Design a protein with these regions (language model features):
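Nucleotide-sugar donor-binding/catalytic module of glycosyltransferases
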Residues: 1-216, 307
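C-terminal subregions of glycosyltransferases and related glycan-biosynthesis enzymes
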Residues: 150, 177, 189, 193, ...
Length: 313
């Protein structure tokens, strides 16, 4: 569990839900990422009160490293047969870990993930599935899933279970990708991934969620920075550092060409339009939007971003 400036009532709900997990053999590793609004001395009593069924340990980063790096350090430090990653504001159903563990063993998978109920700030359920609030979120199962996973993830960190040895072999994480995206991609390259339609957590959707769709995108400039420049860095890192077979190398090479073409097109090089369209299979919606971007009034562009956030398109 990585913690940063937690809302204490949400944190307690999360911890309470961990404490009643029916899976019998747990150990909780907690790292506070140098919180600025909540002191470690405030967090420790909540942990002590809520976590009584299994051992835990807590440590503190001397400077803010971000959740990706914090989860990387926890992955390096933790011991066990499986790792489950935990947010600070969700609620896990009691059978979450036992169902995921049974599935990963039965299916001989590298990673298993579940769907989730969506709740709001007040804990009220607003959707029975993540797919109801994210139109393009499609769960997949099986082998050979890297063809699209390099670009788009479906396994949320708070809802997955991964074999510990596989997670450790994935280190260091891609510094430009969300940790759950990279772990899922790494596992897909090694073997089978299983997605369960059954929701096993109550995921709290709010404006501060790190991986919320189009978080931080407000205009063309922020769109380019978050949805294009960051993705270019992600796939370049994979292309240069990820060990894989020739088939995946080709996918990463063409994916990098597509991303770099998008980046140059947005910067004014309209000769890249054909290349964007050539590789549109990676994301038809993004390709269409960005080809049209130079001709869209700013108000229309912002309306499209708003509509995408609201799951209308």
């Amino acid at each position: 569990m990585a913690i940063y400036n937690p809302k204490m009532d949400w944190l307690q709900e999360q911890l309470d839900s961990l404490n009643i997990q029916r899976y019998p053999n747990l150990h909780l590793y907690v790292c506070d990422d140098c919180s600025s609004t909540v002191k470690l001395e405030e967090i420790k009593p909540v942990l002590k009160k809520s976590i009584t069924a299994f051992p835990y340990r807590i440590k503190y980063n001397n400077k803010n490293l971000g959740s990706n790096k914090t989860f990387e350090l926890l992955t390096q430090e933790a011991e066990g047969e499986y790792f489950a990653y935990c947010d600070q504001d969700d609620i896990w159903l009691p059978d979450k870990l036992s169902i995921l563990q049974e599935t990963i063993e039965r299916e001989r998978a590298e990673l298993v993930c579940s769907d989730m109920f969506i709740i709001n700030n007040n804990g009220r359920k607003i959707a029975n599935s993540i797919t109801k609030i994210r139109r393009h979120h499609i769960f997949r199962s099986g082998t050979g899933l890297t063809d699209t996973l390099w670009y788009s993830n479906f396994a949320s960190g708070c809802a997955l279970l991964v074999r510990a040895d596989t997670a450790k072999k994935s280190l260091p994480f891609n510094p430009y990708m969300y940790y759950d995206h990279y772990i899922t991609f790494f596992c897909a390259n090694r073997g089978k991934i299983i997605s369960l339609e059954q929701p096993l957590i109550k995921h709290r959707e709010h404006g501060e969620n790190q991986s919320s769709t189009l978080q931080g995108v407000h205009n063309r400039e922020s769109y380019k920075k978050i949805r294009v420049d960051k993705k270019v860095d992600e796939v370049r890192w994979l292309k240069e550092n990820f060990s894989c077979d020739n088939k995946l190398k080709l996918i990463l090479t063409t994916g990098c060409e597509w991303m770099e073409a998008r980046q140059k097109y947005i910067c004014g090089d309209h000769t890249k339009r054909k290349l964007i369209w050539k590789y549109r299979k990676y994301s038809p919606m993004a390709s269409l939007l960005e080809i049209a971007m130079p001709y869209l009034p700013e108000a229309i562009f912002r309306l499209l971003i708003w509509a995408s956030r609201k799951n209308y398109i």
